[in-house]
């Protein structure tokens, strides 16, 4: 029972993260990633909803997903059934994705993009261009993990 609950919670967190990430990439980023200037970026972040998601959605989803991935790695590691490989691969993939997010994406967003007045214009443009180009790639491991978690859940006995 614990295995089904923890695997399902990880699947839920991946679903939320995947949905939020897709929404940001398709709807939110285009509203602030172009014509980046230190004196206007903060207003663009506010009006696009990026500031709110960075303060209200991601601080809940990302740490929960990281913690759930660790718990699921431990449970999947010790699980001997048919779901083992799918479950473990998904949990490790999500954990690595969270590590990358916490090591690069969150610090860049908080220290530079959300505080644009402190960064020189040319440098800020390069930071935003790189960040918005790399960020969508985080969705690929989440899509793969989502599929692996579904496969694991089907095979769980």
Per-range role (PLM):
Residues 12, 63, 92, 137-140:
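Hydrophobic residues within alpha-helical transmembrane segments
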Residues 59-73, 139-147:
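Core segments of transmembrane alpha-helices
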Residues 95-103:
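Mid-bilayer segments of alpha-helical transmembrane spans in multi-pass integral membrane proteins
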